[in-house]
């Protein structure tokens, strides 16, 4: 006979119910605490984000209002150098010539089947972010093309091509007697440098235009505290030049340095008694027959000093006229604009300094680079701005662009000049 066990009744039913209630309350409390923690964390995070936004907005607002007086503000707003920096800076107008030079235009088939890397010339220039390309033969325009929404009247930036204009002004100032010679110490014109360091007395003007001054210069355009950024973006470039530091003996080695042209600019304005822009206009830009107004960037409205290393702007055809002048021994027609002796001094490799850069054997002389392999010389600026002079075939090539377009233009311009020479002799 089957039997069943009697199930023992819960002797403490109230205790079980209490435990369940306590567990539920604990779970609810835990959930409530977690929600509070999440809510507090989210509020704190949002407050921090809002604070950072307000700080950034405040810093940006301060920088925007301080753009004419603060290097740090320019670093925040502008960042590094750009090919169209001329749009950011105040400038002085460099007026066009009263007697502009217009080159004769020759209709030629030289460029009809001219190709580079299998592409037609125009296609290649467009693809490499070129904005202007000019070929002069003697006094005749063989090729003039504009690309990527540029035009004949468009403003092109010199960038460091400006240095070649600056050295030319030094040659003219020596010829006019404003400067005695390149062997004068820079302290003859800027004596306050001696208060900074007595060794400045050993630095000559020649050292400054040969890039052998021995001054410190660190290249890092993205760093607003680097020498590179200071010399191109300072709102007081005279003071920046006076803060330059000697790190090695002058005359011993080439070291590309943008403090050098700043000091040259101070020498020019003190020696001539006028702004460097006015000296450019009256002694070079106008006399060489510039067709359009140019300009020279200023460090700031308050300081009013030219950006000596980079800041000349104008039409591509007028930049070509500097190369044309040098091709003709410093003459614009019958007028001797640049002393012939200066042109010879600049373009002879005998006294040049080896730079140790580039695929060609490049030498530096008075802010020009000598392409020894092709017996040519050129002015070069950042983002591949070029005035390339090839005397053997009486050629001047000018290239402007927003960047290099992945091309080694020094070598390519030499190759183009050689190919044009070959085609002209057919």
State the predicted function of each range.
Residues 2-7, 12-150, 178-179, 419-426:
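N-terminal leader/targeting segments and the immediately adjacent pre-domain N-terminus
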Residues 260-267, 308-331, 385-401:
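Active-site-proximal alpha-helical segments within enzyme catalytic domains
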């Amino acid at each position: 006979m089957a039997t069943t066990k009697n199930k023992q009744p819960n002797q403490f039913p109230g205790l079980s119910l209490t435990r369940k209630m306590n567990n539920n309350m604990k779970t609810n409390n835990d959930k409530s605490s977690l929600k509070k923690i999440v809510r507090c964390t989210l509020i704190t995070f949002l407050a921090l984000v809002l604070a950072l936004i307000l700080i950034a907005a405040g810093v940006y607002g301060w920088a925007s209002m301080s753009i004419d007086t603060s290097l740090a503000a320019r670093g925040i707003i502008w960042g590094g150098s750009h090919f169209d920096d001329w749009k950011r800076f105040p400038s002085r107008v460099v007026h066009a010539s009263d007697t502009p030079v217009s080159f004769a235009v020759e209709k030629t088939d030289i460029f009809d089947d001219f190709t580079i890397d299998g592409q037609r010339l125009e296609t290649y220039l467009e693809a490499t972010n070129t904005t202007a390309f000019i070929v002069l033969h003697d006094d005749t325009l063989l090729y003039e093309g504009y690309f990527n929404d540029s035009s004949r009247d468009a403003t092109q930036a010199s960038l460091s091509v400006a240095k070649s204009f600056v050295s030319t002004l030094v040659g003219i100032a020596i010829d006019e007697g404003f400067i005695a010679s390149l062997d004068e110490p820079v302290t003859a014109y800027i004596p306050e440098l001696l208060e900074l360091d007595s060794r400045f007395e050993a630095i000559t003007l020649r050292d400054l235009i040969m890039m052998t001054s021995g001054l410190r210069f660190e290249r890092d355009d993205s760093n607003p505290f680097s020498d590179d950024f200071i010399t191109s973006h300072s709102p007081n470039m005279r003071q920046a030049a006076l803060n330059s530091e000697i790190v090695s003996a002058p005359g011993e080695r080439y070291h590309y340095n943008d403090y050098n042209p700043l000091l040259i600019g101070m020498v020019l304005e003190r020696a001539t008694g006028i702004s460097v822009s006015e000296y450019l206009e009256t002694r070079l830009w106008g006399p060489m027959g510039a067709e359009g107004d140019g300009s020279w960037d200023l460090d700031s409205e308050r300081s009013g000093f030219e950006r000596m290393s980079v800041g000349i702007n104008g039409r591509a055809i007028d930049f070509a006229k500097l190369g044309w002048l040098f091709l003709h021994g410093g003459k614009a027609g019958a007028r001797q604009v640049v002393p012939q002796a200066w042109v010879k001094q600049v373009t002879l490799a005998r006294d040049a300094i080896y730079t140790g850069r580039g695929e060609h054997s490049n030498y530096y002389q008075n802010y020009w680079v000598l392409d020894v392999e092709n017996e040519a010389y050129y002015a070069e600026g950042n983002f591949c701005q070029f005035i390339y002079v090839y005397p053997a075939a009486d050629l001047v090539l000018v290239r402007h662009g927003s960047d290099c377009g992945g091309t080694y233009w020094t070598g390519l311009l030499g190759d183009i000049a050689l190919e044009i020479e070959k085609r002209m002799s057919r």
